[in-house]
Regions:
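N-terminal pre-domain/capping segments
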Residues: 1-108, 143, 181, 267-278
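Histidine-acidic metal/acid-base catalytic patches
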Residues: 1-3, 7-33, 62, 143, ...
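Residue-level preference for long, well-ordered alpha-helices that form the structural scaffold
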Residues: 16, 50-53, 85-92, 127-134, ...
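Acidic-residue sensor for enzyme active/binding pockets
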Residues: 36, 159, 257
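Positions that flank functional sites
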Residues: 42-43, 76, 118, 164, ...
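Active-site acidic/histidine proton-transfer and metal-coordination neighborhood
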Residues: 17, 21, 25, 60-67, ...
């Protein structure tokens, strides 16, 4: 497997102000094989970025000995695909159509997508959507994106996040299968499920549907967002995860998504990723 760094682990990454070249330089210096870039409606990489800009990023990545492991976005948190307001849903679908093209231009084939939310734990002002309504709107939204993803050869990789939606591996599996497309899969985050389940079970159940892996660690005894800790300091059983990944023949990217940025966190993360996976 190839170890990858999320653009968001570096200072200014989550805010979208860190130059991509600087993030790639840091990832290269820390010994990562790849970097997962972040895309937003504003910042250094957006859905309006041009092919020429993407070509330049890709060329620079190769010069630094890096691959681009995927593209991630948090736009669905503020413009939810399952919002009551149709204009909000149209806004995020338009953004995602364009972001899928940017993903292809960047030479990678996985786009991290949050399909909607029943609620948003870090935005108490956000509306609460009934689960069944959320489910139908999420299906409708992704259905409108599938043909674009297939034409571009990019996968819509649905991440399991703290959105009170798609709460079990069986439900995630069946939701993905609904679209009957090789270009819809999972961006599986091992830390995000630890509070309510076992990552290794999710991996075996999702199997080949997994397009990419996110690596985090979490302490169940804390049980809130404060439970996300540095790698090897929580309760994630990385040996069990590696065994499960081997069983499904996954040998792709494992991306450290350690947020928010803290001093020394990128260095600690790189060392831990090498210890776990190298």
């Amino acid at each position: 497997m190839k170890i990858s760094a999320s653009y968001w682990i570096f200072e200014g990454g989550l805010e979208g102000t860190l130059p991509v070249s600087s993030a790639m330089e840091q990832a290269s210096q820390l010994g990562f094989d790849a970097i997962e870039l972040g895309i937003a409606s504003q910042g250094v990489l957006t859905h309006q970025s041009t092919k020429a800009e993407c070509d330049s990023i890709l060329e620079e990545a190769h010069k630094k000995g890096l691959e681009i492991s995927g593209v991630a976005s948090g736009e669905s948190w503020t413009n939810s695909p399952t919002a009551t307001d149709v204009k909000v849903r149209e806004t995020i679908l338009d953004f995602t159509q364009k972001a899928l093209q940017v993903t292809q231009w960047l030479g990678t084939d996985a786009y991290l997508f949050v399909p909607g939310a029943v609620d948003v734990f870090f935005m108490p002002e956000a509306e609460v959507i009934p689960y069944d309504v959320c489910y139908e709107r999420a299906k409708e939204g992704i259905s409108r994106l599938v043909s674009t993803a297939e034409d571009l050869g990019v996968s819509i990789a649905i991440e399991n996040v703290w959105n009170k939606f798609l709460l079990s591996p069986l439900e995630m599996r069946d939701f993905i299968d609904y679209f009957n497309s090789e270009n819809v899969g999972a961006y599986f985050d091992v830390g995000n499920v630890l509070l309510t389940g076992y990552p290794e079970q999710w991996i075996r159940i999702l199997g080949s549907r997994i397009k990419r892996i996110h690596i985090k660690d979490f302490k169940n005894s804390i049980g809130t967002e404060d439970g996300f800790v540095d790698l090897l300091e929580g309760d994630v059983d990385f040996e069990a995860i590696k065994k499960a990944l081997a069983e499904i023949n996954y040998d792709g990217y494992v991306t450290a998504e350690m947020i928010p940025y803290l001093p020394d966190r990128p260095e600690k993360t790189a060392a831990a990723m090498k210890k776990i996976f190298k």
